[in-house]
């Protein structure tokens, strides 16, 4: 085949960052060898794809041959394109019916996946629709009156559309599940079973994930027809991601996080907490330190979640605090640092969290804050994953996680339009951040003190039990402060929510100190750290002082 048609393609600059064997150890195949439509090849190359990754080499030919597939590969190795490319190849644009259903567990992942479909298939003149909970059902009804070839959605909304006979899957030949382990958990499995009742018996099913528990095996035996099994998980951990832990008490975590902000070179960072309340409180504290920060969790209105996700993907802010909402499949290649502010309880959660950095075989950094209650979890995760999470050194070699040429980092596929939510619109400028995102290490002017704080009386239930917790996250706010948009902290809210910890003696009652300089006079007393910590012995340098 002549390559003249490639000459006029708008191909982005080559990604020059080093990659690990997870994506470079291939059989040397090219996308042209798969017999794909030229229009599809044009979209693939214009998206910056150069050659297939190992999972793509294994899965695309088998999917094109019509086989059911059960594929297991590491996070960030190209699983999404492994099912989107064969789906695009087999869609008949002249047939105005849903021909592919792609199910994903979260709304953010649905948005991202639909955009990959549109980007790779932009020369095919096909129609892709995304449908998730939290958006207006009538918008989906109106959209499905028009041709839709590929439907990307979350299980609950897809089942609703099918049960109401709004979406017709009776002639849909391809069924795809991404993050299949999550999709077949107790939360979703019953819904998936009901959705499949609307499909023809001779459908093709593609299941992709990084982990496959027993639930996936039972589903495969029941619903897949002699599936072709792919397992590229020779080890569970992700190559290219340097993993460290810092032993800190709860009240020292914010202090250590501030130190990391000043020492690390962060392109973009995701910070994980174990609860939605702690997500909001930590985002508020980071903003008080003078750093721009967004947050996201499952209890936020969908329109706010969409806005935060879109802004973070486009690089409008460097730091995102979130719950495990964004551990699944989210691909933002500029993220080079993941911080587990709260250490996860399971190896599966840990693996998906740190997999948000080091995408597609590139380098990344994962830092875990550990305290005494996390000893067992640390040991179990190291044992199950067969990896070592090392004590954090005083200086982390930047070559482990930094790309010197930041211009070479590919920008994410642009999301054309965000779905409208069904929640009430927020006030004017409800999503506007009242400060510009900062360069790393140079905090912007911190928010000005507000004299209208409610005082917490001495001896009251709110004040008792909170003394001595100056910077930690003991307690949690009750709801969202009035006037503070979802996901974007606006400095310090009016009043002190119940459960917010008190600050060092000498500060006015109920008024947190302002900006990084407010913490300079507060010395954290050194703590005694034992020599042994579940098999680790190098703890002498982590005695509560900044590392």
From Swiss-Prot:
Chief location: cytoplasm
Biased composition (Low complexity): 457-509
Binding site for ATP: 73-80
Transmembrane segments: none
Motif (Q motif): 29-57
Positions with biased composition (Polar residues): 436-456, 521-547
Short motif (DEAD box): ranges: 178-181
Span of domain Helicase C-terminal: 240-400
Domain Helicase ATP-binding: 60-230
Catalyzed reactions: ATP + H2O = ADP + phosphate + H(+)
Molecular function per GO: ATP binding; ATP hydrolysis activity; chromatin binding; mRNA binding; RNA helicase activity
Coiled coil: none
Residue ranges with Basic and acidic residues bias: 14-27, 413-424
Enzyme Commission identifier(s): 3.6.4.13
Sorted UniProt keywords: ATP-binding, Cytoplasm, Helicase, Hydrolase, mRNA processing, mRNA transport, Nucleotide-binding, RNA-binding, Translation regulation, Transport
Superkingdom field: Eukaryota
GO annotation, biological process: cellular response to glucose starvation; cellular response to nitrogen starvation; deadenylation-dependent decapping of nuclear-transcribed mRNA; invasive filamentous growth; mRNA processing; mRNA transport; negative regulation of translational elongation; P-body assembly
One CC-aspect GO term: cytoplasmic side of membrane
Subcellular location: Cytoplasm, P-body
Region feature Disordered, mapped onto this chain: 1-27, 412-547
Family the entry assigns: Belongs to the DEAD box helicase family. DDX6/DHH1 subfamily.
Domain note: The Q motif is unique to and characteristic of the DEAD box family of RNA helicases and controls ATP binding and hydrolysis.
Protein's job: ATP-dependent RNA helicase involved in mRNA turnover, and more specifically in mRNA decapping by activating the decapping enzyme DCP1. Is involved in G1/S DNA-damage checkpoint recovery, probably through the regulation of the translational status of a subset of mRNAs. May also have a role in translation and mRNA nuclear export.
Protein name (record): ATP-dependent RNA helicase DHH1
